[in-house]
Amino acid sequence: MLKSQRVTTMKESLISFIREKIEEYNYRGAVVGVSGGVDSAVVLSLCVQALGKDRVFALILPERDSSKDSLKDAVDLCETLGVEYRKRSITPILRKIGAYRLFPPRFFLPNSIVKRYVLNRWNTLSKDPFLDDLRNTGPEEFLKGLAYYRIKHRIRMCLLYFEAEKRGYAVVGTTNRTEYLTGLYVKWGDEAVDIEPIMHLYKTQVFELAKEMNVPEKILKKPPSPDLIPGITDEMAFNMSYLELDRILMKLEKNEDLSDEDPKKVERVKKILEFSEKYRRDIPITFDRI
């Protein structure tokens, strides 16, 4: 946990960091992908305070499976901050390339039924979906699921850069330290950015910073989710809360005593780190020079 004074200092440091890097690399402003979640809310707010609202452009890129509540939260945040924004559905692009053929059509099915169906597939196609995701292993149907959700972030990345380069802006990312260490991001998707201002902050610390920055309560109370597959939350993938996960990650990083933690959860975090490190390190895989 960060003390109140440290949170304020961190906020000011990040505002200065964004402003300095934008100028150092000759960018004219910043583009941020806004999802309606806490990470993008914090980053958008930081960019506005660093650069002014006239030099920040927000892009909201929902698709068929996106939460309507999150979409509204994203729009409300942009309007509250007074930034220029564009809302563009990527459903037509995903449909055109055949992504939705990997998943049954929703038509008029209630969201609750879709979520139950997804959870059933999540639990039956793999004994440990998150680890299998990091290892790129599993039955064919599971691998199709990986392709299904990863393409969404990669399409978003292309559109973010399209909007940024038209303006001479930087793409500012929203990945936090917990996501980075555990591999909860899409390679060449949401990790492909120019500046990552919150990658040193664990998820629980991002929440503390969000409170300092007056991020709307509705966003703070929402269960963190990648909003890529209906019904799947971050904590469901990890099999533990962010509070537990961050506490274990911090202790491992500082080589502190773990005897008061659940041994099974500690072992799980270690496994996640083992595979996520390889995921990060092997970008791209190259031929070793002799």
Swiss-Prot record:
Domain of life: Bacteria
Pfam families: NAD_synthase
A single BP term in Gene Ontology: NAD biosynthetic process
Keyword annotations of the record: ATP-binding, Ligase, Magnesium, Metal-binding, NAD, Nucleotide-binding
Chain positions recorded as Mg(2+) binding sites: D39, E179
InterPro entries on file: NAD/GMP_synthase, NAD_synthase, NH(3)-dep_NAD(+)_synth, Rossmann-like_a/b/a_fold
Coiled-coil zones: none
Gene3D superfamilies per record: HUPs (3.40.50.620)
Pathways per UniProt: Cofactor biosynthesis; NAD(+) biosynthesis; NAD(+) from deamido-NAD(+) (ammonia route): step 1/1
Matches recorded under CDD domains: NAD_synthase
Binding-site residues for deamido-NAD(+), renumbered to this chain: R154, K187, D194
EC nos: 6.3.1.5
Catalytic activity of the protein: deamido-NAD(+) + NH4(+) + ATP = AMP + diphosphate + NAD(+) + H(+)
Residues binding ATP: G33, V34, S35, G36, G37, V38, D39, S40, T174, K203, S225
Enzyme class name: ligase
Cellular component, GO annotation: cytoplasm
GO function terms (MF aspect): ATP binding; glutaminase activity; metal ion binding; NAD+ synthase (glutamine-hydrolyzing) activity; NAD+ synthase activity
HAMAP family from the UniProt entry: NadE_ammonia_dep (MF_00193)
Function: Catalyzes the ATP-dependent amidation of deamido-NAD to form NAD. Uses ammonia as a nitrogen source.
Similarity section: Belongs to the NAD synthetase family.
Subunit structure: Homodimer.
Protein name in UniProt: NH(3)-dependent NAD(+) synthetase
Phylogenetic placement of the source organism: Bacteria, Thermotogati, Thermotogota, Thermotogae, Thermotogales
Name of the gene encoding the protein in the UniProt record: nadE
